[in-house]
Amino acid sequence: VNNNDKEQTAVQYCEKHYPAMMDEYKKLMWEQYETFCKKQRNYGPTNISVGTSLETPDDIKLSLTGLWFRINDKVQRLKQLVVLGQPGEVGESVQDTFQDLSVYALIAQIVQNGKWGKK
């Protein structure tokens, strides 16, 4: 890393040195955001809040536990597809599974930060 690179932000550095990778990252993040918004429009926030207001530590723990189960389901799915090389019968691709994992991880952070379902 030269001195000019050290003066750049991490974003500037990555966009300069890895433009194709950064463009792909932003494209995937946008696709995930659009999918997230469509699902929110269809289901609303109660599927994650599990019928609670997410105001107590127990409410948040319940929601995060539910998300843990969903994430674990996806990890098990990846194990079948990638590690064991067994195609599934439900037609969920590796790409779809990675996308779901990414979105669930972000949802968990939103819940933990106290912003889930807030206007």
Residue ranges and their predicted role:
Residues 1-119:
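Intrinsically disordered, low-complexity regulatory regions
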